[in-house]
Amino acid sequence: MTKAQNVDPSEIKKFEEMASRWWDLEGEFKPLHQINPLRLNYVLEKADGVFGKKVLDVGCGGGILAESMAKEGAVVTGLDMGKEPLEVARLHALEAGTKLTYIQSTIEDHAAENAGTYDVVTCMEMLEHVPDPLSVIRSCAALVKPSGHVFFSTLNRNMKSYLFAIVGAEKLLRIVPEGTHDHEKFIKPAEMMKMIDQTDLTEMGITGLHYNPLNDSYKLGRNVDVNYIVHTTKY
């Protein structure tokens, strides 16, 4: 597989079609807005803040996490292959008066030219949308500086995650559009650790992300059966 091939055109098309609603707090991306404070605080805590640090957000989409890190004083670059989401991200940042840079590129191409550039790399809800997640993880490892931090989040692959993320979230509760996820592309934590072990990253911790349908809220916890976040550092 060449670098240019680690993109699923159907995945890009899917998010291109929803791009104009990226910042609609009650739209298809409502869950991302709901979990963003949790993701942001986790990154801030584990990376000892991001103020003044160079941060790369891989698969940034419309810029929800990227913009929030920029507001914390980070020098942020958002990377995505979707043209429409990036245009939405740039416009929203302009309207919000937030300074950051957005680039349309694969992470593999970006890593080839920017190795060892970033203090922090985030790759949230992205690995399950690409053909070769190991290639993305290797590129993240290449992009971060020694002693820097890399964060990955994705979904576990088991019957519970199928019932919660596919049947529940897509088909019954309609929290996200049907077809957003492919359960076969979900990644078990053991598979994630095996891929991380093939790089010069060291796993520092893993936490679960839990949804409560009774009060429509999320929280972090130890159970990683469905959504989870992994914190790594480069040695």
Swiss-Prot record:
It catalyses: a 3-demethylubiquinol + S-adenosyl-L-methionine = a ubiquinol + S-adenosyl-L-homocysteine + H(+); a 3-(all-trans-polyprenyl)benzene-1,2-diol + S-adenosyl-L-methionine = a 2-methoxy-6-(all-trans-polyprenyl)phenol + S-adenosyl-L-homocysteine + H(+). CDD domains: AdoMet_MTases. S-adenosyl-L-methionine binds at residues 39, 59, 80, 124. It holds the Pfam family Methyltransf_23. Disulfide bonds: none annotated. It is an enzyme of class 2 (transferase). Gene3D superfamilies: Vaccinia Virus protein VP39. Coiled coil: none annotated. PANTHER family: METHYLTRANSFERASE, UBIQUINONE BIOSYNTHESIS O-METHYLTRANSFERASE, MITOCHONDRIAL. O-methyltransferase that catalyzes the 2 O-methylation steps in the ubiquinone biosynthetic pathway. This is Ubiquinone biosynthesis O-methyltransferase. It comes from Vibrio campbellii (strain ATCC BAA-1116). The lineage of its organism: Bacteria, Pseudomonadati, Pseudomonadota, Gammaproteobacteria, Vibrionales.
